[in-house]
Amino acid sequence: MAAVEQVSSVFDTILVLDFGSQYSHLITRRLREFNVYAEMLPCTQKISELGWKPKGVILSGGPYSVYAADAPHVDRAVFELGVPILGICYGLQELAWIAGAEVGRGEKREYGRATLHVEDSACPLFNNVDSSTVWMSHGDKLHALPADFHVTATTENSPFCGIAHDSKPIFGIQFHPEVTHSSQGKTLLKNFAVEICQAAQTWTMENFIDTEIQRIRTLVGPTAEVIGAVSGGVDSTVAAKLMTEAIGDRFHAILVDNGVLRLNEAANVKKILGEGLGINLTVVDASEEFLTKLKGVTDPEKKRKIIGNTFIHVFEREAARIQPKNGEEIEFLLQGTLYPDVIESISFKGPSQTIKTHHNVGGLLDNMKLKLIEPLRELFKDEVRHLGELLGISHELVWRHPFPGPGIAIRVLGEVTKEQVEIARKADHIYIEEIRKAGLYNKISQAFACLLPVKSVGVMGDQRTYDQVIALRAIETTDFMTADWYPFEHEFLKHVASRIVNEVEGVARVTYDITSKPPATVEWE
């Protein structure tokens, strides 16, 4: 098999080393917004194992104290790369601590907005950055400058809010330029990536299509076959279309009806993908197999792993059934994994812990016989939507709300049965139907109904009822890393609740989830 270049080897790349800040992913997003490719890895990344050389390195913020015994620290080999380095918040303190300066608790913690004063206008990091509002989030502070560094910026409470090495392109800032509250933060990040690191602004979806198609062809070769999971969602559809563009009929799209799909989903997917996009599609009804294995299981992590493992078994079986005309065996399994999936599943001792196994990157068998191919794993959601439109996929499909790989199984809290799935499925259908009628669908990033494992007393007619509870969720987000709940009008929620209680047998009560991410995740399980 020919060697396949990583995206970070094809495009000039800024490496973001994550120390656990809730804002770390925003650094990557901001850089990509001005067409510079950025990749985030844990701060524990060994530079010798990287396999590519970044144009520059950014050390993120984090919740630790650099002087603590259990504090995470960057691989010192990063300083041997000979590339510019920018430390943000904890990253500044890490740079100073490594250089021998004293870092300790501040007299008072500094959270929220502050006024930045640029002290060194000649510093290239602050080119076209004036005194402005910045966002602070720290309890520790630098007590003295490290040797060979000078001050570039200050705030009222931070005399070393910006520092720079006297002769090397090493910079530190105590504030967070990646958040929108820092009014000129994007300019500062662009100065670092484009002016200081000299990273080419070539990261566009047009360029990505050409690069990724070539990568797929190199990876798969001229004869191998690929089998791909599709669900009718944005991610799997874009991945399937991209694969079809790359290898044509050697790609076999498979829809597994796992018994926990949306209402009429199998028929709709067959029409849209098969007839509309010309993708060769096979529908496999494995609903009984999935539901049987889920019987009696209530733990959400176990559900995910069961669904992931069963999914792989079904695909291996289907791959064996399909006989390619050229006699080659199917070698690859396509998945529509996105970059947020990868970020959320990173787990290392210290700054970050896995919140839950992601349905696209977790729950896979160790002995999986098919090789995984994930052409979208470097992309955020908005990038995937843009890519889909460039590939000729309809606006309606490209902007369809996400649907999780485990489907309604993680929207039925508790044991998953055919009856419980049907209740959640019907409630969800009514909810989405009303959102569309109200003209709100494209204003909302994701919406769904889930069935709670509790019962509630109700009154239907003159009869007392004791039935289940539906929770509705709708969120607004740009990247699914953070999200706010959608503020529906009360009359809208009243109407939806009335329809669900009256039309879905077994439901006595409807609630609306008003929790943001963080602290909650988008899905309940």
UniProtKB/Swiss-Prot annotation:
InterPro entries: Class_I_gatase-like, GATASE, GMP_synth_C, GMP_synth_GATase, GMP_synthase, GMPS_ATP_PPase_dom, NAD/GMP_synthase, Rossmann-like_a/b/a_fold. GO terms for molecular function: ATP binding; GMP synthase (glutamine-hydrolyzing) activity; GMP synthase activity. It comes from the Eukaryota. ATP binds at S231, G232, G233, V234, D235, S236, T237. The keyword DNA-binding does not apply. Its main location: cytoplasm. Its EC number is 6.3.5.2. One of its GO terms (biological process) is GMP biosynthetic process. PANTHER family: GMP SYNTHASE [GLUTAMINE-HYDROLYZING], GMP SYNTHASE-RELATED. Catalyzes the conversion of xanthine monophosphate (XMP) to GMP in the presence of glutamine and ATP through an adenyl-XMP intermediate. This is GMP synthase [glutamine-hydrolyzing]. It comes from Eremothecium gossypii (strain ATCC 10895 / CBS 109.51 / FGSC 9923 / NRRL Y-1056) (Yeast). The gene is GUA1.
